[in-house]
Structures are given as C-alpha cells and as structure tokens.
Amino acid sequence: MNNRVHQGHFARKRFGQNFLNDHFVIDSIVSAIHPQPGQAVVEIGPGLGALTAPIGERMDRFTVIELDRDLAARLEKHPTLKDKLTIIQQDAMTIDFAALAEQAGQPLRVFGNLPYNISTPLMFHLFTYTQSIRDMHFMLQKEVVNRLVAGPNSKTFGRLSVMAQYYCQIIPVLEVPPEAFKPAPKVDSAVVRLVPHAELPYPVSDIRMLSRITTEAFNQRRKTLRNSLGNLFTPETLTELGINITSRAENVTVEQYCRLANWLSEHPAKQE
C-alpha cells in the first residue's frame, strides 16, 4: 500500500502534508491547547481532522483554514464537524488574522500541525498579528522549535529566535517521533506554545528596523558585527550602544538588537 495514502487521501508533497495519527500525541496536544466553548479558535491546516475532531468535541463553533480543496470538501461533509466549522479554503499566508479576531470580538487561539515547508514564513506572518492573538500551539520540525527557544551564544540562535522572542513567550510542549505521522517525515517534530507578550519587554518604534538589522547580521553570521552591520552603524556607535564590535550575530541579545533598531529609527540618515 502506498504510504502516502491515509484515510483515502493522497498526501501531497507540494503542500508538505504529513498526517498525525498517534492518539497519545493527539490527546496531549488537545490537552495542551485546552479549548473552551465560546473561545475564538482557529486551526491552520486541519488535514484529515486528527486534531479537528477532538477539538470539535469541546467546541460549539470554530474556524479552520485549509488550502487543499479536497480536504476542505471532506470537512464540509464530516458527520460531526460540518455544522461546527467555518471553513476558509485559502492560503494561511494571505489571511488577515486581525479581521478574524474583530469578527470574533476577541483574540484568537490559533493552532495547527503546520506544513514544514511553510512553517517559518507563516510564523513571521502571524507575528504581525500578535495583538489579535491570545496564544498559538504548533506542531513544527524539532529543529525549528530549537531555533525558536534558542538563546544568545548558541549555534541555533538566529533571526527567527530574535523575532519570535520579541513578540512571544515560547514554551516547548512535547517532542513527537516520525512514526506518529503518515507518511512519516524524515525529521523529528515538536509541539510549541507561543504566547504573545501582554506588554513587549523591549518595544521598538519601527519593527522594520529590527527585521533589517537581524537579516543583515544573521545573513553574515560568521562576520563580526563591525563588518556585518558596517553599512548601518559605525564602530563608535556600536560601542556607544553597548555592543562589542568583535562579537558575531549570535552573541547579541534580543534586548540589544532592539536597542540597535531604535537607534536606527532615530537616525534615518544612517539607513542610506
């Protein structure tokens, strides 16, 4: 039997589809999410409903976002879910989550077993809506979770670490082996909880500056900051801002990156 076929559906590589089928893992994720009736719950990529069905047992209504038209059609006909679901057949990268929260009249609780080929850009998309989100629970490649929670002075600390920690508190929930899926991915997975900060610990006046600085620094992570950020800051400015010019991108804390971003916002002439 083709191991890409599960419950009569052929897993599509272009959508990065791996379907969760381990009941212990499913129960653990649902318990971690702990959805309550009346909350504005949104699932990204429900697939064959491994999480959708048990979440549906606890909810009167909730929303799912599914790009695959065949899977969306299955959910529309699901005997116990069809009357509970608002199905949005659309790419989650194009969704206005602030509009969904406004329609719901409350912040969203977002969860999903994210396709690994879009998980990082999708999280960056969601970070722009954190004021409209209460929390997020995602199944991700374990390596991505390691990057999310990484601290400075580690090889896994990167732009994703800085931007995620700027917006959210990040809590690993559980690790998931490949055999919990069909077809089994070639990597380990993990579930993570992201809770947007009620108040940003290190607010920046222009998030584009933080994005630009972290992109330039980590795209040249083996260079010293004197070189990787040389087109934005003089060595003297870096020193005045408390940055060691001989350090590298992974040696700088989230707070220090935010300090750099705010300085750059206040000195627009330096951005040329």
From Swiss-Prot:
Cell compartments where the protein resides: Cytoplasm
CDD domains, sorted: AdoMet_MTases (cd02440)
InterPro entries attached to this UniProt entry: KsgA/Erm, rRNA_Ade_diMease-like_C, rRNA_Ade_Mease_Trfase_CS, rRNA_Ade_methylase_Trfase_N, rRNA_adenine_dimethylase, SAM-dependent_MTases_sf
Keyword Cytoplasm: yes
GO annotation, cellular component aspect: cytosol
Xref: PROSITE patterns: RRNA_A_DIMETH, SAM_RNA_A_N6_MT
Enzyme class: transferase
Major location (coarse): cytoplasm
Record keywords: Cytoplasm, Methyltransferase, RNA-binding, rRNA processing, S-adenosyl-L-methionine, Transferase
GO MF, one annotated term: 16S rRNA (adenine(1518)-N(6)/adenine(1519)-N(6))-dimethyltransferase activity
Enzyme Commission code(s) on record: 2.1.1.182
SMART domains recorded: rADc (SM00650)
Residues involved in S-adenosyl-L-methionine binding: N18, L20, G45, E66, D91, N113
Coiled-coil intervals, chain numbering: none
Catalytic activity: adenosine(1518)/adenosine(1519) in 16S rRNA + 4 S-adenosyl-L-methionine = N(6)-dimethyladenosine(1518)/N(6)-dimethyladenosine(1519) in 16S rRNA + 4 S-adenosyl-L-homocysteine + 4 H(+)
One Pfam family matching this protein: RrnaAD
Keyword S-adenosyl-L-methionine in record: yes
Matching NCBIfam families: ksgA
Family of the protein in this entry: Belongs to the class I-like SAM-binding methyltransferase superfamily. rRNA adenine N(6)-methyltransferase family. RsmA subfamily.
Protein name as catalogued: Ribosomal RNA small subunit methyltransferase A
Native source species: Pectobacterium atrosepticum (strain SCRI 1043 / ATCC BAA-672)
